[in-house]
């Protein structure tokens, strides 16, 4: 699971979900990538699930890069708790994803298998996304 090793503050404000990604919008390491088409909070479990889906489909011979990191805590109060008495405890770690951001990159010799692996990963994510190649841009 991806979580920060150490954070300065345990609880943070929620990140804003507006605007488009300013960096990380092109495929720079692999040959194919998953590019976000909308805003979302992607949790560490969703990132791990998508990574496993890619690795199980390509088996061996390829390389996967994860370009996002869940560095923001989202808090939640327990069920049936009255209002007040402070902010809830951190429940999830999320990455704030903006449109245009490349989430995963994949290097694999066979294009058909690579596209199928990335499609399976997209189904694990809570966001609309598309598959891009190194030549395509947002």
From Swiss-Prot:
One Pfam family matching this protein: Ribosomal_L16
Keywords, comma-separated and alphabetical: Ribonucleoprotein, Ribosomal protein, RNA-binding, rRNA-binding, tRNA-binding
GO cellular component: cytosolic large ribosomal subunit
GO MF term (any one): tRNA binding
Gene Ontology BP terms: translation
Family matches, as InterPro entries: Ribosomal_uL16 (IPR047873), Ribosomal_uL16_bact-type (IPR000114), Ribosomal_uL16_CS (IPR020798), Ribosomal_uL16_dom (IPR016180), Ribosomal_uL16_sf (IPR036920)
Sequence segments annotated as region (Disordered): 1-24
Basic residues bias spans: 1-17
SUPFAM superfamilies in the record: Ribosomal protein L16p/L10e
Subunit annotation: Part of the 50S ribosomal subunit.
Function, as annotated: Binds 23S rRNA and is also seen to make contacts with the A and possibly P site tRNAs.
Family stated for the protein in its record: Belongs to the universal ribosomal protein uL16 family.
Record-given protein name: Large ribosomal subunit protein uL16
Organism: Mycolicibacterium vanbaalenii (strain DSM 7251 / JCM 13017 / BCRC 16820 / KCTC 9966 / NRRL B-24157 / PYR-1) (Mycobacterium vanbaalenii)
